[in-house]
Design a protein with these regions (language model features):
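Conserved ATP-binding subdomain of kinase catalytic cores across diverse folds
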Residues: 1-119, 129, 162, 166-190
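S-adenosyl-L-methionine
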Residues: 306-342
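Conserved beta-strand signature within the Rossmann-like core of class I S-adenosyl-L-methionine
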Residues: 374-386
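A short, conserved alpha-helix within the catalytic core of class I
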Residues: 357-371
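Conserved SAM-binding loop of SAM-dependent methyltransferases across substrates and taxa
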Residues: 278-290
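Conserved SAM-binding motif I beta-strand of class I
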Residues: 291-296
Length: 439
């Protein structure tokens, strides 16, 4: 057993206010020191229960009492399974967010059958692991035979309202509501007496809150009745992503072969796939052993990627985000980092993207490059689409002066001094090259 001093570890600032314990990071692992005798005894017993694996399978983050690390001053030191990427509630699709609510209720239901409940019910404690929601606030577990009314009010405020909006196909309103933390127009609006009446039917659940199992089953039924309807206002879900080979790692296409060559050589631990569509290149990176954050601005594409991760048990975290508008830091004191911090990865993949942004949408070339470099620590896999490409020519748009392979080289080389370039991909009117920038 290795005893470590508190000065040797990095504490997660968001947990320092809790009496139960403090989350800290050490040697790329996630721990929690428990300093309260009452909580230490409770969690020691909880983790020895014969049904504990059922709770983990339902969605509580997998946790053990560490057998090799002990934090000085802590009565026990827990180790949590590490979640590769932290996500914001507004980065979830309506379906993914609904799954998070279902997971939270399911975990609480199973706990309540064994004399425990959850104290907290907000979405900042639910993350994604291989496409599956995981409730990460282990010290929200508490021995009790009653669900608190505060838990129900928090669940209504942060889960029921945005889910109700999505179930009525008000997807953008739902996402904007989820962007807000403690204050905001949406949160204030739904506190008004008029709109409060919309959710009066939920108040009936309060009559059975003293019977946790019955209460949570009714809440779960409400969620089933309000499963979000698919957002049909999308442009890219039918965009083909190559699946020539049954195994993506066996592809013979020049573009994929170059990408495979780079990823196999570099062996990145983390990868960010920008504008990933349905996640084809995310799958390739994950199959090669990387933890992958995969984002797209269209919800249907992200849901396809989510289902891919679940079906194939891939370490992919699919989120909704616009490349041009990374999620800013949030929470009290901005303790939860921006997208730049949370999705920072060794290699950034930016394929089939630059011409849409820099030519069609007029995003300045230097800003495109700056955004990519903000995420990347080791290198960038970049697809350059030439102005003579048939798709670009069909738009009839003016080409920016610095939109050239030389222009991109000059910007990317400020951080990554070396580069490797593929052969020109010239097929059916396309003219593109893949460049790997690295140091």
């Amino acid at each position: 057993m290795k005893l470590i001093n508190q000065n040797q570890v990095e504490f997660f600032q968001g947990s320092v206010a809790y009496d139960a314990g403090k989350v800290f990071f050490f040697e790329s692992r996630v721990f929690r020191g428990i300093f309260s005798d009452r909580y230490a005894q409770m969690y020691n017993q909880f983790l020895k229960e014969k049904w504990i694996d059922e709770i983990f399978e339902a969605g509580l983050v997998h946790t053990v009492v560490s057998d090799d690390i002990k934090l000085e001053g802590a009565l026990i030191t827990l180790e949590h399974k590490k979640i590769p990427f932290m996500t914001h509630p507004a980065e979830r699709t309506p379906y993914s967010f609904w799954l998070s609510a279902k997971t939270l209720v399911r975990v609480n239901l199973l706990l309540s059958q064994h004399g425990y409940v959850l104290i907290d019910a907000h979405p900042w404690n639910v993350m994604l692991e291989k496409g599956n929601p995981k409730f990460i606030d282990f010290t929200s577990v508490y021995r009790s035979n009653r669900i608190s009314r505060d838990w129900f009010e928090e669940f209504k405020k942060y889960f029921c309202i945005p889910i109700w909006l999505s179930s009525n196909q008000w997807h953008e309103f739902s996402r904007e509501y989820r962007r807000e933390h403690l204050n905001g127009f949406g949160l204030k609006l739904f506190e008004t007496r008029f709109l409060h009446k919309i959710f009066s039917f939920l108040m009936g659940f309060g009559r059975v809150i003293g019977d946790p199992v019955n209460f949570l089953r009714q809440l779960d039924k409400w969620l089933d009745e309000h499963r979000p309807k698919k957002n049909l206002s999308a442009d890219w879900p039918e965009y083909p992503q190559y699946e020539i080979a049954q195994n993506p790692l066996d592809s013979v296409l020049p573009k994929e072969k170059f990408i495979l060559e780079v990823l196999r050589a570099e062996k990145p631990v983390t990868v960010l796939d920008c504008a990933a569509n349905k996640g084809h290149y995310s799958e390739i990176a994950a199959l090669l052993g990387a933890s992958v954050a995969s984002f797209n601005y269209e919800e249907q594409c992200v849901d396809e990627c989510l289902l891919l991760a679940q079906k194939k048990n891939l370490d992919i975290t699919p989120v909704v985000m616009d490349f041009k508008l990374p999620t800013p830091p949030h929470s009290i004191g901005l303790l939860y980092g921006s997208a730049y911090k949370r999705f920072k990865s060794e290699i950034v993949i930016a394929l089939g993207l630059v011409h849409h942004l820099c030519i069609f949408q007029r995003l300045p070339v230097h800003i495109f490059c700056k955004i990519c470099m903000k995420y990347a620590t080791k290198g960038i896999l970049f697809e350059y689409v030439d102005p003579t490409d048939s798709q670009v020519k069909s738009w009839g748009k003016q080409i920016p002066d610095n939109y050239s392979i030389e222009g991109f080289n000059s910007y990317f080389n400020t951080k990554f001094s070396k580069s490797k370039i593929s052969k020109i991909i010239n097929d059916n009117g396309s003219k593109r090259v893949i460049v790997y920038y690295f140091s």
